[in-house]
């Protein structure tokens, strides 16, 4: 349709949103997004999308795009050396890159077991 702009919204699983919010609240954590969702959207637009799920106040930044997710996260961490406690959550296996800081989502969404694992990682000193 001429003059109509459409925007494909990613699928959100309500339980996953609740578990991510619980992780952020329990561990006083922030979200830095490295998903492909960030590639054509500003941080402000992403925060608006996250606001639909009560997560906007936790989304604080996005990584730059290098085409390599693990590299993007490493570069972000190098740029913020004050970040000591972090967890990388992804469906891709990045355990080799992030060892004791990684939770792999094997189901369709971040679930309760993932939440427990992420909380344990963030509470380690």
Residue locations for each model-derived region?
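Nucleic-acid-processing active sites and adjacent nucleic-acid-binding tracks
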Residues: 10-14, 18
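Short, small-residue-biased leader/transition segments that mark boundaries at the very start
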Residues: 2-9
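C-terminal cap/substrate-recognition subdomain and adjoining C-terminal extension
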Residues: 44-125
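Substrate-recognition element of Asp-dependent hydrolases with the DxDx(T/V) motif
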Residues: 27-46
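Tryptophan-centric aromatic hotspots in well-structured domains and transmembrane helices
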Residues: 3, 34-38, 76-77, 86
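Short loop/turn segments at strand-loop or loop-helix junctions that form parts
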Residues: 8, 36, 90-92
């Amino acid at each position: 349709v001429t003059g109509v702009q459409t925007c494909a919204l990613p699928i959100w699983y309500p339980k996953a949103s609740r578990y991510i919010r619980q992780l952020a609240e329990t561990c006083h954590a922030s979200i830095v997004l490295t998903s492909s969702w960030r590639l054509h959207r500003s941080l402000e637009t992403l925060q608006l999308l996250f606001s639909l799920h009560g997560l906007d106040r936790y989304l604080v930044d996005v990584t730059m795009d290098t085409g390599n997710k693990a590299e993007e996260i490493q570069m972000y961490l190098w740029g913020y050396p004050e970040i000591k406690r972090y967890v990388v959550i992804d469906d891709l296996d990045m355990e080799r890159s992030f060892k004791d800081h990684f939770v792999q989502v094997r189901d369709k969404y971040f679930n309760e077991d993932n939440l427990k694992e992420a909380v344990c990682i963030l509470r380690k000193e």
